Amino acid sequence: TIVIDHEECIGCESCVELCPEVFAMIDGEEKAMVTAPDSTAECAQDAIDACPVEAISKE
C-alpha cells in the first residue's frame, strides 16, 4: 500500500507529475494524496524515490 505522510508533504507536486495515475493534489490544500494505494505502476516507485522530503512510502 502506498501512503503519504501529510505532516511531511510540502506539496511540490513531483509525485503527481511523475505518476498521475497514482497521485493527485488535494483540492484546497497544498498536499498530495494517493488515489490508487494498491497500484503496482512502475512510476509509483519513481515518485517515492523523487520525493524531496521522503513523505511517500510503501507499507
From Swiss-Prot:
Residues that coordinate or bind [4Fe-4S] cluster: 9, 12, 15, 51
Entries under Pfam families matching the protein: Fer4_13 (PF13370)
Cofactor(s) demanded: [4Fe-4S] cluster
Domain of life the protein comes from: Bacteria
Chain ranges of the 4Fe-4S ferredoxin-type domain: 2-28
Keyword Magnesium: no
Keywords linked to the UniProt accession: 4Fe-4S, Electron transport, Iron, Iron-sulfur, Metal-binding, Transport
Keyword Metal-binding annotated: yes
Any one Gene Ontology molecular-function term assigned to this protein's record: electron transfer activity
Cofactor note: Binds 1 [4Fe-4S] cluster.
Record SUPFAM superfamilies: 4Fe-4S ferredoxins
Listed transmembrane segments: none
Chain's role: Ferredoxins are iron-sulfur proteins that transfer electrons in a wide variety of metabolic reactions.
Protein name: Ferredoxin-1
Species in which this protein is naturally found: Desulfomicrobium norvegicum (strain DSM 1741 / NCIMB 8310) (Desulfovibrio baculatus (strain Norway 4))
